[in-house]
Amino acid sequence: MLKKIFLVGIGGGIGSVLRFVVSLLIVRIRFSIFPLTTFVVNLLGCFFVGILVGLSLKNNWLDENVKIFFITGFCGGFTTFSSFSLENFQLYQAGNYHTLVLYILINIIAGCAAVLLGYILTEFF
């Protein structure tokens, strides 16, 4: 059990640092009121989860510890629902209701599509 906790912690730390680095890169190209950083990070995380799940289900390619490290740890630290929720609140407060609805819908639809795409890509491995 302690090993699994350690794997989640290390994976989560790496994911969090990488999320911060990605956000620094994206902030430089920010072009609208659309919260692009969280969207990109969550989309990448969903895509990666899809790949991991696909590999896991296909011939048990991934060991349980590898899944815990990457899916629960890394992807859990890399993606962020709290930032997504805060940005929704900020859009609401600013009166950007159309952007708010669009942001919520695009995140949910694109996130599910990214998981599916990642999963489908594992069919070629």
UniProtKB/Swiss-Prot annotation:
One of its GO terms (molecular function) is fluoride channel activity. Its main location: membrane. It catalyses: fluoride(in) = fluoride(out). It is a multi-pass membrane protein. It is found in: Cell inner membrane. Na(+) binds at G76, T79. The chain crosses the membrane at residues 5-25, 33-53, 66-86, 100-120. One of its GO terms (cellular component) is plasma membrane. Na(+) is not transported, but it plays an essential structural role and its presence is essential for fluoride channel function. Keywords: Cell inner membrane, Cell membrane, Ion channel, Ion transport, Membrane, Metal-binding, Sodium, Transmembrane, Transmembrane helix, Transport. One of its GO terms (biological process) is cellular detoxification of fluoride. Fluoride-specific ion channel. Important for reducing fluoride concentration in the cell, thus reducing its toxicity. Belongs to the fluoride channel Fluc/FEX (TC 1.A.43) family. This is Fluoride-specific ion channel FluC. The lineage of its organism: Bacteria, Pseudomonadati, Bacteroidota, Bacteroidia, Bacteroidales.
